[in-house]
Amino acid sequence: MNDLKLLRSKLSTETIEELYKKLNLLKKELFNLRFQQALGELKNTSRFSLVKKSIARIKTELTKRSNSEEY
């Protein structure tokens, strides 16, 4: 994923399925980053925070949508 800084407006236009796909990709990337760090191969440690924040943004959007559907 090239653009890790996902904008709220961009996330709000995507479907729930697309959001879950992005979430799964980001979780896999975070796993790979942790694995690389454990092996001592990770050079760009700032990527951790970018991936974590992107995951949080997607989860927030999904929660917002699920709460709005209940009412």
UniProtKB/Swiss-Prot annotation:
PANTHER family per record:
60S RIBOSOMAL PROTEIN L35/50S RIBOSOMAL PROTEIN L29 (PTHR10916), LARGE RIBOSOMAL SUBUNIT PROTEIN UL29C (PTHR10916:SF0)
GO terms, molecular function: structural constituent of ribosome
- Give the record's GO biological process terms: translation
Protein name according to UniProt = Large ribosomal subunit protein uL29
- HAMAP family in the record: Ribosomal_uL29
SUPFAM superfamilies found in the cross-reference section: Ribosomal protein L29 (L29p)
**NCBIfam families reported for this sequence:** L29
The protein's gene is named rpmC
Q: Which family does it belong to?
A: Belongs to the universal ribosomal protein uL29 family.
| Pfam families, A to Z | Ribosomal_L29
> In this UniProt entry, which cysteines form S-S bonds?
none
